[in-house]
Amino acid sequence: MRRAKIVCTMGPAVESAEKVKELIDAGMNMARLNLSHGGYEEHQSRLDRVREAAKAAGKPIAILVDLQGPKIRLARFANGPHELERGDIFTITTDEVEGTKDRVGTTYKGLPGDCKPGDRILIDDGKVTVEVVEVKGNDVVTKVIQPGAVSNSKGINLPGVAVSVPALSEKDKEDLRWGMKAGADFIALSFVRNAADNKDVHVIMDEVGFRIPVIAKIEKPQALDNLEEIVAAFDGIMVARGDLGVEMPIEEVPLVQKRCIELAREAAKPVIVATQMLDSMITNSSPTRAEATDCANAVLDGADALMLSGETSVGAFAIEAVATMARIIARTEEGGFEMIRALRTTPKKKGGAITRAAAEVGAIVGAKYLVTFTQSGDSARRMARLRSPIPIVAFTPEVGTYNRLALSWGVEPEVTPMVKHTDEMVKQADTLLIESGRAHVGENVVIVAGSPPGIPGSTNAMRVHVVGDAVGGVVAAYR
C-alpha cells in the first residue's frame, strides 16, 4: 500500500474524461487547478470531470485551486520569442507598450520603486538574468548577464528585494471567490511572506460565507524567516521549489525542504513537495535517475504528497508520470520505511496524545488498522503525522472532510452516516472493515474517537477492538 499521496496538475494533456479516469487509476489523489492559466469555464469543466471520475471510481480526490498570486511578469510582446544576447540593453517599463526585443512592459507597477542599480532581475525562473543599470522614471534599464529567450508573460524574480506587493491581487480575489463557489477543497496561496497573509484570504472567505483550508506556498526567502508562524496560521504548506530555488542559493533548497516538512508534521498539517519532480517526463517516457532519487528523498523526508506540474498538465507522458511516481513512492516506502524520521516533539494537545498512544498500542497488539472517526479530519491528520507503519482508515460523515483527507499521508477516508453513540461507531467500523476486506474477524484494530460523537476536535477515547465482536454481538452493548 502506498502512503504518500500524488498531486496532479490538470491541463490540456489530460483534458478528456478518459484521461482523468486514467490519472486516478494510475494513482492521483489530488487534482490541482492552476489559475495562472485558463479561464473559469475551462477550470470548472476540469473540476467537474474530476468529481465525476472520482465518484465512478469510488475514491476520494481532493481539488486544489492554486491562486496565481502577485507574480511579477513581463507583459506581452508584438512577436517573439526574442533571443537576448550577453551585453544587450533590455528595458522593462511600467508604460503600456507593445513589447520588442529592446523594451517590454511589466504587470508590476512598483518595479521602478523597488529596483536600484546593481540589482539582478531573473526572468523565466532564472533562465535569463539581467542587471539593473539605471532607473529612469517608469523605465528599469538593464544589461543582459545570462542570455536566453524572453516571451509573453514570463515571470520575474528579484532575489533579495522585498517587493511591496499585496498578498492577494484583484485577480486572486476573484479567483478565490470562484474557487470556493466551484467547490474547491483547498486553496493554495502563492508567495506567502508571513502569517498575516492568511487574514486577507479569510476576509474574502467570510464574505462568501464559509471557510476552506488554505495552503501556504513557500517560495520566498521572507517566508523562511517566518516559517513557524506561517505553519501555525495556515492549514498546510507547499514547498514550491521553483521560485524558491531562483530567489535563494540553490544549495539551500534541500535543507529548506526538510525543515518545512518537519515543521508541518509537528503541527499535523499536510505538506506537499512540488516542482520538477519528474520534469524530464514532460517529453520522455522515463525519468532521470536523479529525479527518481529526488522523489524517494521527499518520501523519506516525510512529505504527505508529491506534486506533478507540467508532467501532467502539458506532458506527452502524463499517465506514465503518475504511474512512475506511484511506483517510486511504493518501493521507497517498502524498503526504507524505517528511514522516515520519528517526530522529535511530544504532543501538546489531548487529541495528539490519544492518537500517539493509539499508534503505540497498535504496534504492541499487532493492529491491522488504526481507525479514527472524525468530523474535521483533525484526529486523522494527527494520526498521519506519526508515520506509523499501520495503515489508517478515517470514517467521517462529512463529504468535504472525506475529500480533504485524500491529501494526508497514509489515510484511507470513508464516508459513514452520523451516529449518536461510540458503540454505533464501532459497529460501523466492524461492518465496513469486513465488507471492504481490510480486516477479518478476530483481528485487532485500534479505534480513536470523540465521545459524544459529532463535536469537531473532541477526540478523547481509544479502544482496542476485535473485528467481528460488534457485528457478531459478542459484547452485550453491541446486541
Question: What does each model-found stretch correspond to?
Answer:
Residues 1-479:
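Non-catalytic helical/linker scaffolds that mediate oligomerization, partner binding
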